[in-house]
From Swiss-Prot:
It is found in: Secreted. Expressed by the skin glands. Keywords: Antimicrobial, Disulfide bond, Secreted. It comes from Pelophylax ridibundus. One of its GO terms (biological process) is defense response. Transmembrane segments: none annotated. The keyword Lipoprotein does not apply. This is Brevinin-2Rh. Antimicrobial peptide. One of its GO terms (cellular component) is extracellular region. Its main location: secreted. Belongs to the frog skin active peptide (FSAP) family. Brevinin subfamily.
């Protein structure tokens, strides 16, 4: 249903945000930003 779709969208968005945060953190730690 719609709720399942929204939950999946939230999961996907959360994963994307986490990945970009991890990328930023790792590039700052390695000094390659």
């Amino acid at each position: 249903g719609i709720m399942d779709t929204l939950k999946n969208l939230a999961k996907t968005a959360g994963k994307g945000a986490l990945q970009s945060l991890l990328k930023m953190a790792s590039c700052k730690l390695s000094g390659q930003c």
